[in-house]
Amino acid sequence: LKELVKYLSEEFKGEKNFNPIYLLLQICDKFPLVVINENLCIVEYQIGADSMSQGIYKQYVNSPRSFAKMRLQEMTLKHNTLYDRFMSAIHYVSSCIIANERNWLRNATRKDLVVIAAPLGWILSIYVKRKVTKIL
């Protein structure tokens, strides 16, 4: 587990944080899961400008490469529907545009979906950038 966290922190060097869901998906892929029926942690969610959900647009801009990686992975998950994969493709294109990733199509796992989703991804990237500008 330590090696995986170290690898991910090196892979996303320069980003303020990488998406925790991507880390969880990587762990689920590499290690067996144990199913238990008990609470392990109780979390109080922050409300306001500092909360994670309120700052999600900032996270998209601050860590676009980790979001793009997560979307790539989501496009390959067997349990995802075509709709889910298409939505992931839109978000993948948006994250790549925000990250100034030039090889976004070459790196795509589902090139067909990514090409179709490209115009919507471009629109989403403009929307996210404008939301962040309004927040700041």
Model-derived features: where do they sit?
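Conserved nucleotide-sugar donor-binding catalytic segment
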Residues: 1-55
